[in-house]
């Protein structure tokens, strides 16, 4: 299982703590040092069944400075995926990718129902 996170993010820290406390093994990946690629994001989006907007870090400074709230509705899905792949700080975190699931953000109840 792959955990894509930003170490300074308090939500990511909580997620890692939850995984550790529950004895769930994962491989850690720093979202800025190795941001998700276009191909990865496209695959994970398809597997997740979630709307693509859920992959955006809507509370992030980068999202707000680019005024993406207004721009995203006019962009194609392909353009949005390419944009996400340009900067890890645009991506909602943590991202957890398993063989048959993708989690966007930390939701302990959702994680527990799949991982325990």
Describe the role of every protein-language-model region:
Residues 1-22, 26-31:
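Local sequence-structure signature of Cys/Sec-based thiol-disulfide redox active-site neighborhoods
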């Amino acid at each position: 299982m792959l955990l894509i996170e930003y170490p300074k993010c308090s939500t990511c820290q909580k997620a890692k703590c939850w995984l550790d406390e529950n004895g769930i093994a994962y491989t850690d990946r720093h979202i800025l040092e190795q941001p998700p690629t276009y191909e990865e994001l496209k695959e994970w989006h398809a597997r997740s069944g979630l709307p693509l907007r859920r992959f955006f870090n809507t509370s992030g400074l980068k999202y707000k400075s680019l005024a993406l709230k207004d721009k995203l509705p006019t962009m194609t899905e392909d353009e949005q995926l390419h944009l996400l792949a340009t900067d890890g700080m645009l991506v909602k975190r943590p991202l957890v990718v398993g063989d048959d699931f993708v989690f966007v953000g930390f939701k302990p109840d959702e994680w527990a129902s799949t991982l325990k």
